[in-house]
Amino acid sequence: MARLMSSALIRGLVRSSCSPTVAAVAQPTIHQFRNYSSGLGGDSTATGDSSSTRVAADPDTHQDFQPTTKSSNMSFDDIVSQDIKENPVLIYMKGYPDAPRCGFSALAVRVLKQYDVPISARDILGDLKLKESVKAHTNWPTFPQIFIKGEFVGGSDIILDMHQKGQLKDVLGDIAQKREQNESS
């Protein structure tokens, strides 16, 4: 039985290493934020009560490789406000644009990518405090939540509806033009 399982495992590994490679295709710019999170409970450093974990007893650990903490005096509400203000197209979503973890988030990204605009995103699954701050900011219960030019637009259903009616092109038009101007400069 063990021999059978190991043979099957080896055959599977050999097959996967022989699979064809996929060519890279140019895609719109996507900014993926690092959450201020250390786990599901949220990040203690975002509220100012940070604690550092260091390996003091290990003389071989170089300072460059010792763990560090991100310290920030910003509240989650401040982070949400700053994200919205600084990013022309922002999605608070489950996962990231390159690896969405929900069908609705994937749909929103797919629609927005058609307009060749820079998309900024933040994964809300990594931090419940961030997720709750976004919900409180918009008074909207579901994700993804999409902001365009500092305005809350809605979720994937609203973006899809705007796309189908031609409204999204008008809203995103000047963002795409600014990107083209920056690339040609």
Curated annotation (Swiss-Prot):
> InterPro entries this protein is in?
Glutaredoxin, GRX_PICOT-like, Monothiol_GRX-rel, Thioredoxin-like_sf
Q: Which residues form the Glutaredoxin domain?
A: 77-179
**In the record, which residues are listed under signal peptide?**
none
Q: What superkingdom heads the lineage?
A: Eukaryota
Q: Which Pfam families match?
A: Glutaredoxin
Record localization: Mitochondrion
Q: Which GO terms describe its molecular function?
A: 2 iron, 2 sulfur cluster binding; metal ion binding
Q: Which family does the record claim for this protein?
A: Belongs to the glutaredoxin family. CGFS subfamily.
Write the protein's name. Monothiol glutaredoxin-S4, mitochondrial
